Amino acid sequence: MDGLPGRALGAACLLMLAVGSLGPGVWGSPTPPPLPAAPQPPPPPPGAPGGSQDTCTSCGGFRRPEELGRVDGDFLEAVKRHILNRLQMRGRPNITHAVPKAAMVTALRKLHAGKVREDGRVEIPHLDGHASPGADGQERVSEIISFAETDGLASSRVRLYFFISNEGNQNLFVVQASLWLYLKLLPYVLEKGGRRKVRVKVYGQEQGPGDRWAAVEKRVDLKRSGWHTFPLTEPIQALFSRGERRLSLDVQCDSCRELAVVPVFVDPGEESHRPFVVVQARLGDSRHRIRKRGLECDGRTNLCCRQQFFIDFRLIGWNDWIIAPTGYYGNYCEGSCPAYLAGVPGSASSFHTAVVNQYRMRGLNPGTVNSCCIPTKLSTMSMLYFDDEYNIVKRDVPNMIVEECGCA
C-alpha cells in the first residue's frame, strides 16, 4: 500500500479481501432510509497525536468523507475497482451507442424481468440495492440477453450474429437458452378459422466456411403476429465449452413468403421486435460462510461495527451501463478492535495473516500489529447491466454487501 494517500488506506486495506467493504467514498440516494447517528471517529493511527495502540496499524489512515469535507477521488476509484472486480470486468463497458429502448423494454417484458417507468428508469424485483433474498449458499444463475445483428443481405435465409458474454468464466453451465423471433402476419386471404403453418429452421454456423449444422427446426401455426422461441441450450453450451462468444445463426422460413409471414430481423422500423437470445447459466461456487454476529454502528460505541452507506451509480457516472439498481448499500466496517475481540475465523484470519506478512516485509514487528475491523459476512446483490457487447446481463453478484463486521 506504499504510495497511497493516507485517507485511502482504509479502502486499500479492505480491497485486499476483494469484498464489499470499502471506505464510503460515494454515497447518496434518491430516497435513502434513515440511517443511525454517525459513529464517533475511530482513534487516530499509532504515532499520530492522540494515537492508540488499539488501532489497526494497516487501517489507521481511514477517514470518513464527512471528515474530509468532500468526495475523495481515491475512495471513488476504490469503489469502482471493487464493483468491476466483483463483475469480473477489467474496465467499464464502452457505451458508444445505447441499445434501442424499445428493444430493451420488449426483452424485459417478455422475460417478466421488470418494468420501465415513465421516466425511463428500470424497476426490477429484488434489484433495489439490498441483499438478494435466498441468494447466499445457493447456486447462482446469471441471465444474459443478447440482441441480434445481421449481415443485411436480403434472402430467404438470414444470418444473425450474437455476441454472448460468458461473464468472465469458461466453466459456465447453460441451464437453458433460447432464440426469441417475432413473426409478423401481413394481409392474406385464408379460409375462415384457418391458420398459417410455416416451418422455421435455425442453423448454427462455425467459423470455418461451410461448417453449418442444424440447431433447431420448428413448425409454427400462426393465427396472429407474435413472439416464438427456439431452444438453443446445446449449441450455446458448446460455444462456451470452446471458449467462444460469437454465435452465428442462419434462419430460414419455409413457406413464409407464400403465406405472407415475415420474420422480423434487424429493422430500424421494428426495433421493439429485434430478435434476441436469452441464456440462463450457472457457476457453482462453494464459499465459506461466517455467521458471527456483528454490531451496528449507532453512535454509542467505538467498537468494531457496521456502518451503512449508499453508493449512487449516477454520482460515479455509471448509470449509463448499470440499468438496475440505481445504487446499493455497500456498507463498511469501522471501530476499534481490543485484544478480546480478535480471532474471527475464515477469511478474516486469512486477511490478518496477509497484513502481518506485509509488515514483516517492511521490517516491522508483527507483534505490534493489532486487529483490524473487517467484514466477516457478505451477501449477494442482483444487478442488471450492459457488457462490452451490449448484452443485457442479469446476475446475482456475490460479496457485494457487507452484512456483519468483526476483528481479526
UniProtKB/Swiss-Prot annotation:
Propeptide position ranges: 29-293
UniProt entry tagged with the keyword Disulfide bond: yes
PROSITE patterns assigned to the protein according to its UniProt record, in alphabetical order: TGF_BETA_1 (PS00250), TGF_BETA_2 (PS51362)
Annotated Pro residues bias: 30-48
InterPro entries: Cystine-knot_cytokine, INHBB_C, TGF-b_C, TGF-b_propeptide, TGF-beta-rel, TGFb_CS
Signal peptide: 1-28
Cystine crosslinks: C297-C305, C304-C373, C333-C405, C337-C407
Gene Ontology terms: cellular component: extracellular space; perinuclear region of cytoplasm
Region listing for Disordered, in residue ranges: 29-60
Sugar-bearing residue positions: N94
Subunit and partners: Dimeric, linked by one or more disulfide bonds. Inhibin B is a dimer of alpha and beta-B. Activin B is a homodimer of beta-B. Activin AB is a dimer of beta-A and beta-B. Interacts with FST and FSTL3.
Family indicated by similarity: Belongs to the TGF-beta family.
Protein name, entry field: Inhibin beta B chain
